[in-house]
Amino acid sequence: MPERAPLTAEERALPYAKFYDLPITPIPEDKLAVLAGGPIDPALALKIEDRNDLFLPGDLPCEIGYCVMENGAGFLANRTFMPGVTPEMFDWWFAWHSLEDLRYRIWDPEDHFYARQQNREKTLDQSLPMRERTWGTQHVVLEDIGGGPDPLILNFRYPHEMGYDESKVGTEACATMMCANGHGPVPGEGVAAIMTHFVREVEGGIVLRSRFWIGYGLVDGQLVKLVPDGVSVPLEIVQGLFAHNLKEFGHLAAILPQVYAENKDNW
């Protein structure tokens, strides 16, 4: 088990510090089997050009899995049932966790170090709908997805900026969503990715459908492949991010109802 950094006295005094001490929620056996089973057939992957298929009813050919696609980009999908979680809680979490380091660390105490909101005034603007307090903001993140702590910039976008049909967000098709283009601290260096977290409300909670397209970026308002033709994203990077996603969202599903109940007004 990775060693957790000790909390400072100031952090230990925070009302949500107790969540840092919880054991990580085990990844379900069926998901571990997918991880161990190796990559899916790339033909099952959702092409980034077809991303609005997420709004279609039912499931897509791959809801849980990872691969390197034929064009060299990486793809991963995860489906997480989050019992007792509402779309409002999910939107709140993305705004709330970016304001203090420990809030991000309780999400995955072994692999998360900080997520720092660069647009605090917008995130704290109570006149905005909760999801819009994250849309259009930037998080500076330090996390470990398998290769040691790695700095990352996450630019959260309004869905229409990422080519999604934003008019369907907040409907039966999609209760809410978070999407971002991520890259290293120096744009153009390292591996970039397009991230989407798509939420459906179901009986007893929500279903979170996550998609990552690794090797893509947002350039001049268009989602483009940044990996040169003939070059592929290393499979171990895709597999590592898939494993991390299974872990972090499984744990968030376990803690979010209580974190929200106790801290929803604690900005």
Regions from the PLM with identified roles:
Residues 101, 115, 143, 220-221:
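Amphipathic alpha-helical interaction segments
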Residues 154-158, 194-199:
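Broad, structure-driven detector of short, well-ordered beta-strand segments within folded domains
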Residues 75-79, 194-196, 205:
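Extracellular structured ligand-interaction cores
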Residues 189-193:
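Amphipathic hydrophobic-ligand
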Residues 14, 26, 33-128:
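Hydrophobic ligand-binding cavity/cleft-lining segments
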Residues 112-187:
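Glycine-rich portal/gate segments that line the openings of hydrophobic small-molecule binding cavities
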Residues 1-70, 184-188, 198-267:
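Terminal "cap-and-tail" regions of soluble proteins that handle hydrophobic small molecules
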